[in-house]
Amino acid sequence: MKICMIGTGYVGLVSGVCFADLGNKVYCVDKDQKKINKLKNSLSPIYEPGLDDLIRNNLRAKRLIFTHDLQKAIKDSQIIFICVGTPTKK
């Protein structure tokens, strides 16, 4: 299955990597190009035990794609998860 995770914070990144490890092709999308570049080099912006190894293995297997191209990721996906912060009223 092809899955799109919009947002590569804690929820989007960990969920996306786990979906990829289950054999799905996962697009992880973020507007922060620096974060995407780090993730493409297997450098996680968050700490979660074992996450770096899962990122590395799934990048190598071509099941995990980090991108800032939201339109392409949505077009190529069957399921889309929106994993961005929810604004609160002040």
Report the location of each language-model feature.
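Structural/interface elements that position substrates and couple domains in central-metabolism enzymes
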Residues: 1-90
